[in-house]
Curated annotation (Swiss-Prot):
NCBIfam families registered for this protein in UniProt: PRK00099.1-1
Key words of the record: Ribonucleoprotein, Ribosomal protein, RNA-binding, rRNA-binding
Pfam family, one: Ribosomal_L10
Organism superkingdom: Bacteria
Lineage: Bacteria, Bacillati, Cyanobacteriota, Cyanophyceae, Synechococcales
CDD domains: Ribosomal_L10
Protein name per Swiss-Prot or TrEMBL: Large ribosomal subunit protein uL10
């Protein structure tokens, strides 16, 4: 039995809400994936605030209709699609999808959309290879710490150098 008009409108409204909160969307070909595998993907995405939705392309088309940010997704809406909508940790969610695809070898990323720009598979792969937010913060903290250490050593070296020069001058004056 098909869905009623009211249930379709609810789905479109839910998709609009999710798109309004999302920073990035990925379109996956989910053909051949079992329910268990889809559940596994959804579980992996939860850690990075990602949601995986399987819906008809027509309903997604209605959800993005008139929305300038998401309208470019229209070109990817053909075939059997699952939509990964990500808010928050974009890199972590892309990594989760990529590791899932590597393990199952059944799903393929058709493309994605980030900040209104349509992304190719290569661009999505590049996002997945970026370090996580935590790693970047640790690298920045390490770099800042290294600079302060070098400044402290440099500041400490000025009086030490002066003291050595005075001692050397005093020693040369005694002989």
């Amino acid at each position: 039995m098909g869905r009623t008009l009211e249930s379709k409108q609810q789905i479109v409204e839910e998709l609009k809400k999710l798109l309004g909160e999302a920073e990035m969307a990925l379109v996956l070909d989910y053909q051949g994936l079992s329910i268990k595998e889809m559940s596994d993907l959804r579980t992996r995405l939860q850690a990075s605030n990602g949601v995986c939705k399987v819906t008809k392309n027509t309903l997604m088309r209605r959800a993005i209709d008139g929305d300038s940010v998401w309208s470019s997704l229209d070109s990817l809406l053909n075939g059997t699609n699952a939509f990964v909508l990500i808010k928050g940790d974009v890199g972590g969610a892309v990594k989760a999808v990529q590791s899932f695809q590597k393990e199952t070898k059944k799903s393929e990323t058709k493309g994605g959309l980030f900040e209104g720009k349509l992304l190719s598979q290569d661009e999505i792969k590049a996002i997945g290879e970026l370090p996580s937010k935590e790693v970047l913060m640790a690298q920045i903290a390490g770099a800042i710490n290294a600079v302060t250490t070098k400044v402290a050593v440099g500041v400490n070296e000025v009086p030490s150098g002066l003291a050595r020069a005075l001692k050397q001058h005093a020693d040369s004056g005694e002989s």
